[in-house]
Amino acid sequence: TGAAGFIGWKVSTLLLEEGYRVVGVDNLNDYYDVKVKLWRLDTLKSHENFKFYPIDIENKQALEVIFQDNHIDAIINEAARAGVRYSLENPFVYLSTNTLGVLNLLELAKDFGTRKFVQASTSSLYAGQKMPFVEELPVNTPISPYAASKKGAEAMLYSYHYLYGIDVSILRYFTVYGPAGRPDMSIFRFIKWIYQEEPIELFGDGSQSRDFTYIDDIAKGTIKALKPLGYEIINLGNNKPDKLIYAIELIETYLGKKAKINYKEFHKADMMATWADITKAKNLLEWSPTVSLEEGIKNTVEWTLKNWDWIKDVKL
């Protein structure tokens, strides 16, 4: 699900390259500019083993048709309303997609005998905990409706694992970036703004840090999580927090331009820092990240410039 989304697209791409049949689902909503989603989707449609359904995971009846038409061995649920700040403006859609949408998929997995479920979750759940974040920390105090909706999904997944034996891998992703990334996230926005010589919007002073994790690493970890694990929550992160201002400096270097910074007040629903402990991913999935922030931002800048003919028109 979320096949035209950032992570769903890359996971689908790698699975198709490995020879799997992929059934992609996406509602192509306009939370961010659909041009980016359509570009991703076009690259997937060139594969003969890719079948696409333009539907919403909130629509159980439409989902049921997919399960009737296809034998689904595993569900990788990357469909979600994303974005911490927007969840304060429209909390209802976060619950209906991120929690009730998961329930729809679980009911169909139960009814049609799909034994494996990989769920995209978030480092946002760790707000207020001590770093580096380990999976066993109690994450009972989400500071945004977005985080709360993902916590609800994790809890529902446990119930269905316990009751019906569905094998569940929950992946808590840490700040994912890279080529064809989300235009609502800082790296995409900063590259576009700096290249166009427009001022960038920076919430806070840039000293906040993120465990930036490159898209290819995230997608490979997600595919490794298809193995039978029972019920496990696993961090996928770079295990190395970097200050936001450092990411900006890297973008300046690779573009050969200086950023004009428009400082804004730090947002209450944002976290000051994220840092993943990835011991569990190493042990259970034999996964660890391979792409440094320097290399990842360089790749992202190069991809942006190569595709500038349509990216220049992407709304931020």
Enumerate the language-model features and the residues they cover.
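A conserved pocket-lining segment of Rossmann-fold NAD(P)-dependent short-chain dehydrogenase/reductase
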Residues: 87, 136-141, 166-179, 190-213, ...
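Short alpha-helical
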Residues: 6, 61, 82, 181, ...
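C-terminal substrate-binding subdomain of Rossmann-fold SDR/epimerase-dehydratase oxidoreductases
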Residues: 14, 20, 55, 194-316
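Glycine-rich phosphate-binding loop at the start of an alpha helix
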Residues: 81, 85-88, 147, 184-187, ...
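Hydrophobic alpha-helix immediately C-terminal to the catalytic Tyr-X-X-X-Lys motif of short-chain
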Residues: 152, 156-160, 190, 247, ...
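N-terminal Rossmann-like NAD(P)+-binding domain of SDR-like oxidoreductases, especially those catalyzing
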Residues: 1-176, 299-307, 316
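A glycine/serine/threonine-rich, flexible loop-to-helix segment
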Residues: 132, 183-191
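Residue-level recognition of oxygen-bearing side chains
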Residues: 62, 93, 100, 138, ...
